[in-house]
Amino acid sequence: MVKIEDLTVKYPDGTTAVDNITMNINDGEHLALIGANGAGKSSLILSMVGVLPSDGSVEIDGVKLGKSTLTDIRRLAGVVFQNPDDQLFLPTIYDDIAFGPRNMGLDEESVRYRVEDRLRLLGIEHLRDRTALKLSGGEKRMAAMATVLAMKPSVMILDEPTAFLDPKARRNLINVLKSLPHTMLIATHDLTFAAEVCRRAVVLRKGSVFADGPTDELLFDDELMDAAGIESINVYIGNIFKK
């Protein structure tokens, strides 16, 4: 379970990026984090794993975020960044996925088992000996997810996971995420994706929680979404078919 209480993030110039956010994410829940650019989504994500300094409290599976618990927090909560190139930097995908387990001190046999298990789970065994430089956006996304899953986190945090994906790769990602048992926090502008993968959504506005409720209610609420600076699914679909 993830517990966030009175979380505030301020940048050196005095800008408040996250303003006194309190929310919980239940075990196994897939929560969509929705908001316009600058609403605080990325700042919230980074503060949850100690990348950005913050005031308030973050607790993941009973471990409270602090200087002495950073390693534990980052093992419990794995972040899949918006740009998969940030997580794929070694000669082969095998090495990228093995990087975390090796740093945990696992022996090579255990590392090999974890890597091959994650490759199999995501259906990317054929990428084992490939370099990220030769992969498509969808292949990179799956490989980046495998690097996180190899650490066996209980919580997955994904920042704009459908970025760089073509429709087929996007559908594959949806199917994979729906099949995983992990607790998930998914920051996204892709509202139809959020509606399919997440039953609950939190809408941010100016760094604060503007709305929290069932995804299929919030994302279709034209007035609420407009007030948050986002185009609702209804408006989005209407514009597609507008003559």
What is each residue range found by the language model?
Residues A194-E196:
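A short, surface-exposed alpha-helical micro-motif characterized by mixed small hydrophobic
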Residues T188-H189:
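H-loop/switch region of ABC-family ATPase nucleotide-binding domains
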Residues T131-L135, E139:
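Conserved ABC ATPase signature
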Residues E109-L127:
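Conserved ABC ATPase "signature" region
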Residues D216, F220-K243:
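ABC ATPase nucleotide-binding domains
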Residues K206-G207:
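Conserved ABC ATPase "signature" C-loop
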Residues G56-L65, I73:
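Conserved ABC transporter NBD signature motif
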